[in-house]
Structure formats: C-alpha cells, structure tokens
Regions:
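Bacterial N-terminal signal peptides that target proteins for export
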Residues: 1-9
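Bacterial N-terminal signal peptides
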Residues: 10-18
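Sec/Tat signal peptide C-region and signal peptidase I cleavage site
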Residues: 20-24
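N-terminal segment immediately downstream of the Sec signal-peptide cleavage site
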Residues: 25-68, 72, 173-174
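Short, surface-exposed binding/anchoring microloops in extracellular/periplasmic proteins
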Residues: 56-96
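Hydrophobic residues positioned within well-ordered beta-strands of beta-sheet architectures
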Residues: 67, 80, 102-104, 137-139
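Extended low-complexity, serine/threonine- and proline-enriched intrinsically disordered segments
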Residues: 93-113
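Helix-rich interaction surfaces within compact, conserved domain-sized segments
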Residues: 114-174
C-alpha cells in the first residue's frame, strides 16, 4: 500500500512540476511601463513593429507629460493612463487636434521573429482623449495571442483610432 501511495505521489509531483514549468512565471506574467514619450520621428521612419504588424508614427510630433501602462499576460488585464498627450507642432500645438479618442495597443514580437516577420497587434477599445490630452483604460483584452505571452519583445503604444501612434511607453519592467 505504501509503495502505491508513493508511486501516486511521485506521479502527481512530476505532473505538477511539468505544468508549472509550462506556465509563465509570475514575475514574467506582469509587464509594466513607467512613462510615455511622444513620437519624435514621423511616419514610417518612426515605425514600431515588423511587417504587417508595423505601426507608423503620426505625421506630426507629439508629447506626453506622464503616464504608465500595465498588462497581465496570463489574464489579459490591461490598464493605461496617459496625461498631456498633445501635438508638439502644427497649428494645433498644445492640443490633441482632431483626435477625440485613442486606443492602447500591445505590439507583440516587435522584431517579427516568431510570426514570419510580422508583429502581432492587440488593441483596447477606443477611449476618450480629453482636451488636455488625458486618457485612461482599465479592462480585459481576453486571452492574448502566443506572440504576446511567449515573446520577450513587447511594446505599448497609444494610437489614433485610424492606426498611427502618438506615444510609446518606455522603461519596461521586467
């Protein structure tokens, strides 16, 4: 009887160890960025990502005064806050221009190495962008694609609803 119990315990231990190594470690499940920087290089010259998943920078430079973003890769929970996201040039300088909404976008596998040369994009629903350039999202994106969970190169952008990005999150941890 003791031999059977030990065998079952040993099998259960091996199964648990195998399952735990296949799952993301808790310190790798959560990614955060502590700041945002507005796009400096405009158009394709400032693109983030690869192939069909590349996101071009907006046609004019933008600035952001502060913000942060956090994502739990295992659950799909994401939160971002950005303040002072405004144009740094054009006749609309100091305002968000004609952009009443923005989306937050994860750019997964930025070098395209896992996706045949293409990055994978996952975006939030549109959220309001105030006249002062403030936007906030807190929600769940659902199950994230493998490129987001398994690849270490992930970027976070705040974009227009038409696709170009205004700001990139910087200082990624971990």
């Amino acid at each position: 009887m003791k031999t059977k119990a030990r065998t079952l315990l040993g099998a259960a231990t091996v199964a648990l160890l195998t399952a735990s190594t296949a799952m993301a470690r808790p310190d790798q499940e959560r990614v955060r960025w502590e700041s945002f920087v507005g796009n400096i290089r405009t158009g394709a010259a400032g693109a983030v990502g690869s192939g069909t998943g590349a996101v071009n920078a907006a046609g004019a430079p933008w600035v952001a005064t502060r913000g942060d973003a956090r994502v739990n890769l295992a659950s799909g929970n994401l939160r971002f806050r950005i303040k002072g996201l405004v144009l740094a040039d054009t006749i609309f300088v100091g305002t968000p221009g004609n952009n009443p909404e923005v989306v937050g976008t994860l750019v997964c596998d930025t070098d395209g190495s896992a996706g045949g040369g293409n990055s994978v994009l996952v975006s939030t629903p549109p959220v309001p962008l105030s006249a002062q350039g403030d936007a906030d999202f807190n929600g769940n994106l659902g199950s994230l694609p493998a490129a987001c969970v398994n690849e270490p190169d992930i970027a976070f952008l705040v974009r227009s609803v038409t696709g170009v990005y205004f700001a990139a999150a910087i200082v990624r941890e971990p």
